[in-house]
């Protein structure tokens, strides 16, 4: 975040009262970050209900018009905030996301942001997503499971709000989180969680078949 080209950034580090070195590492950059004109950074460490509860908290604390939300192991491209801020000024989007550079032990690959003919997670890139603060407050993450981000995006999409995927790398994602674990149990869990979102919003069972195929291919190739 220190190297972002956009001048005015309010940055919150939301930590769930962890016992590791998260707070001390974040604190070591605090003075340098706050010394940059137009920048402010705050660190909050207190018990929460997980990642999406922390993201909801960040949206409530923010003062800007748009909010980007990224996890500790991931990082933005230097022009990420500027790209998404300028896009918002032109388009006044509710939700926008870019492509991500996926970092793996075997090299990097680009996951391209698209809308696609079907509304699926295949082209949804949460680490590269920015939303208007108003939308994040109106549609908070429901705190149901690890796919709360897709639940949020689906709700916004089906309510007819303006969404804008752009095929430009916005962030770098470290492969190896909850959504990448290889086991039949984890694949089945992901399938059930995402189908639960489709069902919740009255979407066709065809989406379940599409996701089943996606998880099968993912299980074989990873």
Model-predicted segments: where are they?
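Conserved nucleotide-sugar donor-binding catalytic segment
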Residues: 114-189, 193
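Short aromatic/hydrophobic "clamp" motif used to bind/position activated sugar donors
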Residues: 67
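Acidic donor-binding segment of Leloir-type glycosyltransferases
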Residues: 2-44
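Acidic donor-diphosphate engagement hotspot in glycosyltransferases and nucleotidyltransferases
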Residues: 22, 55, 76-83, 107, ...
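Conserved donor NDP-sugar-binding/catalytic core segment of glycosyltransferases
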Residues: 75, 79-110
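Conserved short acidic donor-positioning loop in nucleotide-sugar-dependent glycosyltransferases
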Residues: 1, 16-17, 49-50, 72
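Glycine-rich, basic loop-to-helix element that forms the pyrophosphate-binding segment
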Residues: 37, 44-62
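Hydrophobic/aromatic residue at the end of a short beta strand that borders the catalytic acidic motif
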Residues: 51, 70, 75-80, 102, ...
């Amino acid at each position: 975040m220190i190297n972002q080209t956009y001048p005015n950034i309010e940055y919150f580090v939301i930590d769930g009262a962890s016992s590791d070195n998260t707070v001390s590492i974040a604190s070591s950059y605090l003075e340098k970050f706050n010394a940059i004109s137009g920048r402010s950074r705050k660190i909050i460490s207190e018990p929460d209900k997980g990642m999406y509860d922390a993201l909801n908290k960040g949206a409530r604390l923010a003062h800007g018009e748009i909010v980007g939300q990224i996890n500790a192991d991931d990082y933005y491209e230097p022009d990420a905030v500027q790209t998404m801020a300028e896009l918002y000024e032109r388009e006044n989007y509710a939700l926008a996301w870019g492509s991500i550079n996926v970092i793996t032990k075997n090299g990097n690959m680009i996951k391209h942001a698209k809308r696609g003919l079907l509304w699926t997670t295949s082209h949804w890139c949460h680490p590269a997503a920015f939303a208007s603060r108003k939308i994040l407050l109106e549609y908070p993450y429901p705190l149901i499971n690890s796919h709360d981000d897709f639940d949020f995006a689906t709700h916004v999409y089906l309510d007819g709000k303006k969404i804008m995927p752009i095929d430009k790398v916005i962030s770098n994602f470290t492969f190896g989180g909850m959504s990448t674990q290889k086991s039949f149990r984890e694949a089945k869990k992901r399938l059930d969680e995402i189908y639960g979102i489709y069902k919740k919003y009255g979407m066709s069972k065809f989406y379940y078949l599409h996701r089943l195929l996606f998880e099968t291919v993912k299980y074989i190739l990873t």
